[in-house]
Amino acid sequence: MRELFPIALLYAWIQVIAHLFLSQNAFFALTMGWRLGTDFGWFRDQLHLFSNLLLLTLYSLFVTGMVQKLWKRSKDLLEVTGLSFVATWTLIGSSSMALDRPLVAQPAWLLYALFVFFLVAIIKGSDRYLRRWPILPWIIGIGLVSLAYQLANGLSDYSISGLFLRMETLFSTIIGDGPVHYFSVLTWSLLGPLLLFLGLPIPKILTYPSTDFESLSLNIEAILSKKDIPYPFTLYTIQAPFALVGGVGVMMGLYLAIYSYHKFKGKNISKAFKWSFLPLLLNQPLPFLLTVPVFFQPLVLVPMILSTLVLECLTILLIHFQWLRPTVYQVPDGTPSVLFGYLASNGDIRYLIYMIAMLLLSVAIYWPFVARMKGVGK
């Protein structure tokens, strides 16, 4: 997957630009008054479309690369890989382009891998017919174009992007107004690293601080009324300040652990790994995830869960003993995750101090596991 890094890096920087400058709640729009999203609306829309195209290309190339490895013969390789690319683009992207649906920025590798095995099985099963009727691939290609048209205009809910949308809706229904007890917050938070490990799409509620819950509104009303907040333990107050630094599983801790371990051992670090740091700092983990083996890697899952659990338990204790004020204020899009706690607490400097301590602790948790990984960061 490292061959796809340039596409992921370009996508990440487009998202960074959009969230910092062009979105409705962009960081500089709210902090500096730069309303570039209004003045350059057409440019913003084109960037959004282009970022979707980049993700489609990345997904399609991922499937194509897996098909190449499974095909294991040079004959018909060009036709097979071309068919794989078109099929992936059709099934994932046609409805997204037509209905302007956002694509999942943390790819569902497991679903795409299963699609590859299904696709290769179909192609190998029809191999003898392809040799007998050379025109059959053209018929399949025309059928795919027709399928793309149907997906874009009438069957969009049955495309893969439609499946992701229904999964997101189902998850939102299940979680309701969000967990408001520390045990339920811990349980929901641990679901994110598990889904990332399994290569399944992670609901947006678990990857970004969500302001859609009623508990957040009630907390803000209580603060403005100078009363005790009714819900001190929520995803916004427990998970968002520390456990989402760099992404689910405290990815920034993993990055710093890999970097410091290689420096300590005197090993070289790849340019791709270094270039993924700034996007990771600005809440875009996709380039970093393409340089680190996360999919079905127990050596990554265990410290991801431990880091999330330890950091959130410490946050619960800090809030319980009133050593920290809960984060209740909404922050702009694109806010670096290391500054979230400081801004969402209305400038509580203790969040910056605890952030350093929490990152060092997560590095310590990841360190022994990084020492066992092979080829990471090279």
Regions found by a protein language model. Name each.
Residues 146-216:
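Aromatic-rich transmembrane-lumenal/periplasmic boundary elements in polytopic membrane proteins
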Residues 215-304, 308:
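Helix-loop-helix junctions within the multi-pass membrane cores of secondary transporters/permeases
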Residues 30-36, 288-378:
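Transmembrane alpha-helical segments and their short flanking loops
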Residues 1-128, 295, 313:
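Early transmembrane hairpin of solute transport permeases
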Residues 44-59, 177-198, 227-249, 340-364:
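Hydrophobic alpha-helical transmembrane segments
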Residues 57-73, 121, 193-200, 237-267, ...:
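Transmembrane alpha-helical segments in integral membrane proteins
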Residues 36-47, 68-72, 231-236, 257-271, ...:
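Short juxtamembrane and helix-loop transition motifs at transmembrane-helix boundaries
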Residues 1-9, 69-78, 131-144, 180-190, ...:
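Alpha-helical transmembrane segments and their helix-start/interface "positive-inside/aromatic belt" motifs
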